[in-house]
Amino acid sequence: MFLNSFIKLIIIFSATSLLLGCKADSLEIKLSDKDIQSAIAGEAVAIDFEAEFSMLGELDDENKATLDQLLVLAEEFLSLDDFEIAKGDFGAKVFLEGSIPLTANPEEESPWYVSVSPYDSEFYIVQLKTGTKFDRLESAMSDINFLLSADPFHPIKYKLKAPGSTVIAPAVEIGGITHLY
């Protein structure tokens, strides 16, 4: 009886470790005022992103196989430039670099995209959203492991180059100093 409970606990812990790997620890998106203006004008714009994921526990053969399947899936749904796995203090760290669309089109297909939408006559809202292929990605991840799912929301840091522009944000970091508004 104790052995059965222990095995179930290990399975739950392993599944939780993989599940935690589906929400980015950090997501950095780089864009400029010119990118935003181009997207508003209806042009196709791709902006760079960097994401970091953590996996708790040891990177054994089973987890490596799952990561390989997730990488193939990510390459199918995302535009990736680089993929790296590094050993961390408490498990593996996965780093992804690539590009995602920046668009004013609310019907964007990509699983994730950066949306630009009017706020009032002078300002625009820039935010990460999920596109029409998000549900397909989530379903494909569940096919790999029924406990896996993509997370629609991630902690985001925008790196914006917009000299002379007015930006309204609840919190910003300028020159390494954080400001809350």
Where are these regions (language model features)?
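Short N-terminal edge-element motif at the start of the domain
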Residues: 24-35, 58-74, 78-80
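C-terminal motif of bacterial Sec signal peptides marking the signal peptidase cleavage site
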Residues: 20-21
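Bacterial N-terminal signal peptides that target proteins for export
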Residues: 1-10
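Post-signal peptide N-terminal segment of mature Sec-exported envelope proteins
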Residues: 30-51
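Post-signal-peptide N-terminal segment of Sec-exported extracytoplasmic proteins
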Residues: 44-73, 136-148, 152
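Mature, soluble, non-transmembrane domains
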Residues: 72-181
